[in-house]
């Protein structure tokens, strides 16, 4: 199970009350922990590096928990108040603890968590590097392809250097088999110069195309 209820200690309440304007007690909150993601290769042929998990452990503290990656104030369910990277049989897991205020509005989601209906979670973050497991180069720049075998080694993409962590969501279909995670990892804009160059090239192409039509060259070419 990827989400499970946890007891709330005095130390937990001290962390939780950092995010609350009203002083809360253990009776006021429902606390649970989640396996957010791990270092195993997922169904997309990607894997977080152990370094990335530790970076996310720092960044996700204080982040909100929503559903289906729909960012709105009304869609906020819980807030993460502590995290931990756990070693587990040769791979690493990012564990997060979150709390939900016990209110009439939140009673339904608490029931769904308690009964195991809502238990898969998803992380949304941005990463700086996507590294090929075969050659160690930037994955988008090399010729290797995910899931293909090269000299007996299956290619996958390692996600590394997490730049920001946005939120954790409850989802229906997981990508990571063990952790039950559907991830959304946008590439951080570290290739801004290259992107700007491509934009310039596209603008120049459109400018030339406009001139081509204005001069009637297109018509002459058809004739």
Where do the model's predicted regions map?
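Signature of dsDNA virion morphogenesis modules
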Residues: 1-223
